[in-house]
């Protein structure tokens, strides 16, 4: 999908930071996150486990425990800053204007309520539907996400369904409020390849039919490349590269992005060992003072010990690694 650069953003995230309280004090988990999301656009958040993707997504709707977390920056939806909104107004937006599909439906769905009751709850809250009217709409939603034998299965409990069916139920709950933005956090985790493809095809169809914007969180670069318009690559709590999905895959600017792409095995190659990025993401309390990827980077230089701000480039691109910009024109 081609998004006009002149389209006003639906969501605008500026200088987002997230800290968590620990026994040793406050620890920063995510910082310096900036991005926009246009109407009907799909943005992929990409990175290894521990890169800050899910922490970023949960913070957009203030879903972290307020007693043990603190948020910085701003998240503006249609001009309203979600970080300063009254709880009553935020509740109107959650699940209605902005909805979320979580990565682990078996732990997200209520085990003591039927799937029908759980869908009807959102319909009552956001649309005022009751009784038969709510049940009829719940059946329509389950049918829309392709749950078979809906009239019977609407009264089943989550544990009676397969992983793929539970994820479809989560999607039905998410779209019940007719959201403008859908956040999908690793929606295909723990599903086999065939079911993964079915879930992604379902999300693609719903996105187009309902004219939604989507934030897709995934460690699977191949999946993101087939679904997203743009990508934001995260490492150790920071974005390290953003840009149109085709540009990121064809001409990665940051060594971490290049490493992720190189780690995708080619089925035509006869490999004794899968390609990997050496090392691991540092713990939040042990991040290096300069470039956070430098200890794992084969291109590291002396200047990498200094903080690396992300630089905006032509073509809607940005990177946190100046040495990897031989052909780009910096606009800062």
Swiss-Prot record:
Q: Which UniProt keywords apply?
A: ATP-binding, Cell inner membrane, Cell membrane, Membrane, Nucleotide-binding, Peptide transport, Protein transport, Translocase, Transport
Which CDD domains does the annotation name?
A: ABC_NikE_OppD_transporters
The disulfide bonds in this chain are: none
GO CC: one term? Answer: plasma membrane
Q: List the transmembrane segments.
A: none
The EC class name is translocase
- Indicate which residues the UniProt annotation says bind ATP: 47-54
What's the short name of a Pfam family annotated to this entry?
Answer: ABC_tran
Query: What GO terms describe the biological role, i.e. biological process, of this protein?
Result: peptide transport; protein transport
Membrane topology of the entry: Peripheral membrane protein
The record's listing under PROSITE patterns reads: ABC_TRANSPORTER_1 (PS00211), ABC_TRANSPORTER_2 (PS50893)
Localization per record:
Cell inner membrane
Query: E.C. number, please?
Result: 7.4.2.-
Q: Which residues form the ABC transporter domain?
A: 11-261
Q: What is its main location?
A: membrane
Q: Which InterPro entries match?
A: AAA+_ATPase, ABC_Ni/Peptide_Import, ABC_transporter-like_ATP-bd, ABC_transporter-like_CS, Oligopep_ABC_C, P-loop_NTPase
Is Cell membrane among this UniProt entry's keywords? Answer: yes
Q: Name one GO molecular function term.
A: ATP hydrolysis activity
Q: How does it assemble?
A: The complex is composed of two ATP-binding proteins (BMEII0205 and BMEII0206), two transmembrane proteins (BMEII0207/BMEII0208 and BMEII0209) and a solute-binding protein (BMEII0210).
Family label: Belongs to the ABC transporter superfamily.
Function statement: Probably part of an ABC transporter complex that could be involved in peptide import. Probably responsible for energy coupling to the transport system.
Q: What is this protein called?
A: Putative peptide import ATP-binding protein BMEII0206
Species of the source? Brucella melitensis biotype 1 (strain ATCC 23456 / CCUG 17765 / NCTC 10094 / 16M)
């Amino acid at each position: 999908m081609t998004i006009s650069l002149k389209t006003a953003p639906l969501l605008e995230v500026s200088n987002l930071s997230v800290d968590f309280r620990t026994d040793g004090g406050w620890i920063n988990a995510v910082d310096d996150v900036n991005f926009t999301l246009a109407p009907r656009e799909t943005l992929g958040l990409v990175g290894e486990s521990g890169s800050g993707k899910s922490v970023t997504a949960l913070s957009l709707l203030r879903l972290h425990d307020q007693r043990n977390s603190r948020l910085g920056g701003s998240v503006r939806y249609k001009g309203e800053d979600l970080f300063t909104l009254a709880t009553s107004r935020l509740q109107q937006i959650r699940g209605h204007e902005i909805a979320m599909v979580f990565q682990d439906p078996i732990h997200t769905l209520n085990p003591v309520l039927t799937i029908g009751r759980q869908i009807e709850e959102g319909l009552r809250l956001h649309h005022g539907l009751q009784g038969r009217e709510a049940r009829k709409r719940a059946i329509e939603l389950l049918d829309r996400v392709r749950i078979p034998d809906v009239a019977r299965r609407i009264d089943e409990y989550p544990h009676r369904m397969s992983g793929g069916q539970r994820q479809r139920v989560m999607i039905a709950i998410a779209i019940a409020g007719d959201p403008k933005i859908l956040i999908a956090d690793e929606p295909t985790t723990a599903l086999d390849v065939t079911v993964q493809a079915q879930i992604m095809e379902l999300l693609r169809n719903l996105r187009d039919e309902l004219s939604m914007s989507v934030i897709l969180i995934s460690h699977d670069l191949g999946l993101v490349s087939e679904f997203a318009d743009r990508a934001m690559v995260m490492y150790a709590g920071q974005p390290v590269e953003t840009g149109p999905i085709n540009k990121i895959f064809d001409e990665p600017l940051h060594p971490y992005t290049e490493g992720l792409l190189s780690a995708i095995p080619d089925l035509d190659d006869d490999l004794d060992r899968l390609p990997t990025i050496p090392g691991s993401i540092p713990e939040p309390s042990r991040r290096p003072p300069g470039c956070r990827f430098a200890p794992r980077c084969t291109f590291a230089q002396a200047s990498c010990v200094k903080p690396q701000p992300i630089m905006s480039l032509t073509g809607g691109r940005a990177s946190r690694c100046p040495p990897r910009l031989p052909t780009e024109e910096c606009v800062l």
